[in-house]
């Protein structure tokens, strides 16, 4: 069996990793061994943070909805409960958008929730 020299393959593999590590500080962008570890760690962070992004946005929407609901004399949980009872199907993302950009529409929804709660 002939001997395989790794010149082309190794160069391609190294180049692929070093390209991904472009912009990293110091040895992390220049030395293959260090760059490979940095790229693997970056991929782990990216995977984890794609999951966290969903949680963080939901938390942000809830904070915004709560702030707007309190301007109308409701807490977040009572607003959501009232909207459910009034069978208003609107998700938190769009509710937060209304709370920030269309206060009049949000006010109408808050009134609907109050009526459904009997208040």
UniProtKB/Swiss-Prot annotation:
UniProt xrefs under HAMAP family: Ribosomal_bL20
Source superkingdom: Bacteria
Coiled-coil ranges (or none): none
Keyword rRNA-binding among record annotations: yes
Gene3D superfamilies in the record: 6.10.160.10, Ribosomal protein L20
Gene: rplT
Role: Binds directly to 23S ribosomal RNA and is necessary for the in vitro assembly process of the 50S ribosomal subunit. It is not involved in the protein synthesizing functions of that subunit.
Family (UniProt): Belongs to the bacterial ribosomal protein bL20 family.
Keywords: Ribonucleoprotein, Ribosomal protein, RNA-binding, rRNA-binding
Assigned GO CC terms: ribonucleoprotein complex; ribosome
GO biological process: ribosomal large subunit assembly; translation
Gene Ontology molecular function terms on file: rRNA binding; structural constituent of ribosome
Annotated protein name in UniProt: Large ribosomal subunit protein bL20
PANTHER family: 39S RIBOSOMAL PROTEIN L20
UniProt xrefs under Pfam families: Ribosomal_L20
Native source species: Coxiella burnetii (strain Dugway 5J108-111)
PROSITE patterns to which the protein is assigned, alphabetical: RIBOSOMAL_L20
């Amino acid at each position: 069996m002939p001997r395989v020299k790794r010149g082309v393959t190794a160069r391609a593999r190294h180049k692929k990793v070093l390209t991904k590590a472009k912009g990293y500080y110091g040895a992390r962008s220049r030395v293959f061994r260090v760059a490979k570890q940095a790229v693997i760690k970056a991929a782990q962070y990216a995977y984890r943070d794609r999951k966290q992004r969903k949680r963080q946005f939901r938390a942000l929407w809830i904070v915004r909805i709560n702030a707007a609901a309190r301007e109308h004399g409701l807490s977040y949980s009572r607003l959501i409960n009232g909207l459910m009872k009034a069978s208003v199907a609107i998700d938190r993302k769009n509710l937060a958008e209304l709370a920030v950009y269309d206060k009049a529409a949000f006010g109408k929804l808050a009134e609907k929730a109050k009526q459904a709660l009997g208040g």
